[in-house]
Amino acid sequence: MSEKRRYFGTDGVRGKVGQYPITPDFVLKLGWAAGRVLAKQGTKKVIIGKDTRISGYMLESALEAGLAAAGLQATFTGPMPTPAVAYLTQTFRAEAGIVISASHNPYYDNGIKFFSSEGTKLSDEIELAIEAELDKDIECVESSELGKAVRLNDAAGRYIEFCKSTFPHKMTLAGMKIVVDCAHGATYHIAPAVFKELGAEVVAIGVEPNGTNINHEVGATDVRALQAKVVEEKAALGLGFDGDGDRIIMVDELGNKVDGDQIAYIIARDALRRGELKGGVVGTLMTNLGMENGLKQLGIPFVRAAVGDRYVMEQLLAKGWKIGAENSGHVILLDKVTTGDAIVAALQVLASVVDSEMTLNELSQGMTLYPQVLENVRFSGDSNPLEAEAVKAAVIEVETELGEKGRVLLRKSGTEPLLRVMVEGEDAELVQSSALKIADAVKANC
């Protein structure tokens, strides 16, 4: 739709806790507004999960109050990965799923994102309808119609069994040592159990959430601890999840990082080998040229979507394809799940490792990653770095120097005043200096 959303960003409503809109009063009203819209859809039942941020308790209570005022029943799962909430929303035939999380962001941020009854992101139409309700004063339903809350005590067990069901039944992980880094986030009590029950020897780190340590120097956004542990333990590989369990970054037996592009490449190549690949692969504007070239050599079609898993999903649905990914670790496998699921994606790579009797490092060799540098540059909230003449001039200079063997991409964050500067090319030193040149232009002028 052409109408602009005021509160919903690319991944729900997100911000710093205690600052609008992530305040108890706004979240209560958001719960009521969502409840008003969803109550018209059908069952009046909503699944609510969260990650391990301390603010999750406060926001959970506010959401529940708002939903109850609109006459909806809330079912709490406790700390649960985002894809688990999508799965449970489907299996419980709920009208919607709600996740309280800011994904890979620091603990002092939080957010609210919604899933439809099919376990997919809400449509623009529904989000706009919720925003329209936010402009109204809260009106409670009749006392006899108020919603109530219940707790789902076996949510973790249900999701663990689902994850295991996506791994080939005749395979086992016996004899494989795996380091699992849960980022002190929502997978902390899920991921180790999944891999352990499939037979692996699991060394778990990032599994001691205290409310403020989520994503701090651990997990998919900072794999240094995971790399060190894999080498120290002489493990077969490492799995790094982000705070809400929808991103996966892997580490091979040598301690090398294996990102979302490489993970999708391995999964697609394996599906092609088995004759089960349906169509091609959807990446994003950030996808490494090496992945595109590697897939091309295999004869696998590839297209780029705008950055963001919702846009990858749009392309997948439009083309009828099943595999999509972002290099940040969102991997969507529509033949198994309805949204990015880090544990399920990891299991598909592990199946390839077991079946091929190759190491993760060997499986990653099929594609050559171009050196790629990403600089995150903060700017003044009221400026637009994409329109700054000095920034434009720096980009032109860099593009001229890189020629046809590289590319530049500037992208504003959908959730904060941050410009992502990506430079890619064959020469690592040139790529690094080029990214810094553009970043410096942003800092000096915006």
Curated annotation (Swiss-Prot):
The keyword RNA-binding does not apply. It catalyses: alpha-D-glucosamine 1-phosphate = D-glucosamine 6-phosphate. Activated by phosphorylation. The keyword Magnesium applies. CDD domains: GlmM (cd05802). Binds 1 Mg(2+) ion per subunit. NCBIfam families: glmM, PRK10887.1. Belongs to the phosphohexose mutase family. This is Phosphoglucosamine mutase. It comes from Vibrio atlanticus (strain LGP32). The lineage of its organism: Bacteria, Pseudomonadati, Pseudomonadota, Gammaproteobacteria, Vibrionales. The gene is glmM.
